[in-house]
Amino acid sequence: MAAMATPQQCWLPTRARAPPPPPPRAPSSASPVSGAPASLRFRGRRAASASASAARRRRGASLPCSPRCALETAGPGFDPLGLYNDGPSRNDTQSPLSNFFGVLSPVFGSSSGGRKEKSYGRGAAAAIEDSSIDIGDFFKGPLPGKFLKLLGYLALSRLGIYIPLGGVNRDAFAGNLDQNSLLGTLDSFSGGGIGRLGICSLGIVPFINAQIVFQLLAQLYPKLQDLQKKEGEAGRKKVLQYTRYASVGFAIVQAIGQVLFLRPYVNDFSTEWVLTSVTLLTLGSVFTTFIGERISDLKLGNGTSLLIFTSIISYLPASFGRTVAQAFQDGNYVGLLTIILSFLFLVLGIVYVQEAERKIPLNYASRYSSRSGGLQRSAYLPFKVNSSGVMPIIFSTSSLALPGTLARFTGLEFLKKAAISLNPGGALYIPTNVLLIAFFNYYYTFLQLDPDDLSEQLKRQGASIPLVRPGKSTAAFIKTVLSNISVLGSAFLAVLAAGPSVVEQITHLTAFRGFAGTSVLILVGCATDTARKVQAEIISQKYKNIEFYDVNRFDQ
């Protein structure tokens, strides 16, 4: 009958157990791993030392022992580095804390002899651990300088609002502005520039109109679309340059329309005054567009959105003050409370939808987990529910303003009727606005995310969507997902656009019309986008200081 193995002989796994130790008279001539497989031969020196120590304990010898020897003779359950955790546990009474460090030790631990192992997973973990942000991180790197430049650019853009055109009766014009809902909305986008008749009152609107035109032309002319997508950064710069030229033309047309609209309020309407006013308004629009591009270069957010964000913030106190004054004048306290509650729920809903996303899991062929025996599925492809942001609403508002501008420029009767119908409160305002928002949202979503390009990128990276074949099937799947998401996003934006009109009819308060759900969406969207850009900038600075293979830094 075979003798039962002693505990000192069972420190190796059962499937590759070492032979019994040699006789005491020849302890150095044995090799405890002579019958072990190749995967365990790197433990040979340590196994021999452990066998010799066990033999000395059986003989009761009291030989001098080094610190390393003391660690080896500490008992069969002593394994601080977790070198033998692939076999059966030798100590079932270990604490949960010991088990936790035993799991972490193969990643961060050292091999025998005190030599540090190079950890390939520690760099990413360190970057994630160091991604926490405090106030001190904000003042490191180029962020303070970028924010000072941003504040300077925004102050310059606001300066042109307070430089007025000469020879206009502002009081009479302000009274007409309160009665025109669409002009009130555009006035909120310009930060009160239209009401003050500033030289920068056109703002960024001509540039937005030029962007709309070129995005539509890209669908009609394949060469323009190839220039925008296939030629990379150089092609996009060319399209941007063409958009700038077109924005100057739109600025001239809109400036002429605004000057003709101001004719009843001008004291001395002459050709000289018209030329001077058109030139000043056009230069003001070009200057605002230039500032928007400089803000975009700072990579702290979209320059166009930040300019509109600043304008809305500056317009908010006056708009809310008029609403409160009208409510107290009419004694409509219930309507005022309804508007305040609607505003709070609107902000919460916008934040919820803006942060919502559809996550599509991805499989990477190069990421095979030997422990789980399959592909890792930690990566995913995120799609925002409202991936187009505030741009569809801005495009829709600018499109609704075009008939009024053309009517003032041409004086055609059918354009005047169309402009009246497309004003907030008109018969065609809500359905036309909803349709335009749905169209621009669908178009802008696929302009930002091309399913064919995404499918090709995933294929090059060795990634695939579970149960979906790479190539055309992946592109079709992504297109279906984006189409479904765009429907939800369009419904959300349509509620934002039409909701204020419904609240206005319920509360009978019209002074708050210029600051609608569109404005709240722009505020929340720009604020969250800028916060993400700042966080990404801070984390990128931390990545620059991380040595991904410097284990000595993390083992202290």
Curated annotation (Swiss-Prot):
Reported function: The central subunit of the protein translocation channel SecYE. Consists of two halves formed by TMs 1-5 and 6-10. These two domains form a lateral gate at the front which open onto the bilayer between TMs 2 and 7, and are clamped together by SecE at the back. The channel is closed by both a pore ring composed of hydrophobic SecY resides and a short helix (helix 2A) on the extracellular side of the membrane which forms a plug.
Transit peptide residues according to the UniProt entry: 1-68
HAMAP family: SecY
Cited InterPro entries: SecY, SecY/SEC61-alpha, SecY_CS, SecY_dom_sf
Biological process per Gene Ontology, one example term: SRP-dependent cotranslational protein targeting to membrane, translocation
Entry-linked Pfam families: SecY (PF00344)
Domain of life where this protein originates: Eukaryota
Keyword check for DNA damage: no
UniProt protein name: Preprotein translocase subunit SECY, chloroplastic
Keywords in alphabetical order: Chloroplast, Membrane, Plastid, Protein transport, Thylakoid, Transit peptide, Translocation, Transmembrane, Transmembrane helix, Transport
UniProt keyword DNA damage, yes or no: no
Gene: SECY
Membrane topology annotation: Multi-pass membrane protein
SUPFAM superfamilies the record matches: Preprotein translocase SecY subunit
Places the protein is found: Plastid, Chloroplast thylakoid membrane
Annotated organism of origin: Oryza sativa subsp. japonica
Record region (Disordered): 1-59
Compositional bias (Low complexity): 27-54
Known partners and oligomeric status: Component of the plastid Sec protein translocase complex, which is composed of at least SECY and SECE.
Similarity remark: Belongs to the SecY/SEC61-alpha family.
Ranges of biased composition (kind: Polar residues): 1-11
Top-level taxonomy: Eukaryota, Viridiplantae, Streptophyta, Embryophyta, Tracheophyta
One GO MF term attached to the UniProt entry: protein transmembrane transporter activity
One cellular-component annotation, GO: chloroplast thylakoid membrane
Principal subcellular localization: plastid
